[in-house]
């Protein structure tokens, strides 16, 4: 079995550290990547960390993960609330997917309360800040053990 975990980040997450630090905190996406790589290594995973602002690229990465990864952590950003394409891409693969959000989407604007991705994912972690990514890695370790 593969030990690869692909961490996929959607639109605007490249702006972490600058964008609304009161909501998302001060960590950059690179900081979160470092946390994931280190935590993943401790769990026996090789973590590949990616970000794109383009929905089709995220779909392609999910398809790729279905071919070669043990699991996926995805923060779809705003696509969570609109993307049937991401929902369908997750349903198309057997690789377990954990959805992550830095903020608690249920405590924010009403349009953020519903995720189109969640029904297709194994589970969702939200509201724990950047540590949610590490939590997702631990969940995948449990799921894939």
Swiss-Prot record:
Q: Which InterPro entries match?
A: DHquinase_II, DHquinase_II_CS, DHquinase_II_sf
Assigned keywords, A-Z: Amino-acid biosynthesis, Aromatic amino acid biosynthesis, Lyase
Q: Name one Pfam family in it.
A: DHquinase_II
Name the pathway. Metabolic intermediate biosynthesis; chorismate biosynthesis; chorismate from D-erythrose 4-phosphate and phosphoenolpyruvate: step 3/7
Q: What is its EC number?
A: 4.2.1.10
| Gene Ontology BP annotations | amino acid biosynthetic process; aromatic amino acid family biosynthetic process; chorismate biosynthetic process; quinate catabolic process
Q: Name one GO molecular function term.
A: 3-dehydroquinate dehydratase activity
User: Which enzyme class?
Assistant: lyase
Catalytic residue positions: 24, 101
What's the domain of life for this entry? Bacteria
SUPFAM superfamilies for the chain: Type II 3-dehydroquinate dehydratase
- Residues the record annotates as the site (Transition state stabilizer) are 19
Give me the reactions it catalyses.
Answer: 3-dehydroquinate = 3-dehydroshikimate + H2O
Which positions in this protein are listed as binding substrate? Answer: 75, 81, 88, 102-103, 112
Q: What does this gene product do?
A: Catalyzes a trans-dehydration via an enolate intermediate.
- UniProt xrefs under HAMAP family: AroQ (MF_00169)
User: Which family does the UniProt entry place this protein in?
Assistant: Belongs to the type-II 3-dehydroquinase family.
Q: How does it assemble?
A: Homododecamer.
UniProt protein name: 3-dehydroquinate dehydratase 1
**By which gene is this protein encoded?**
aroQ1
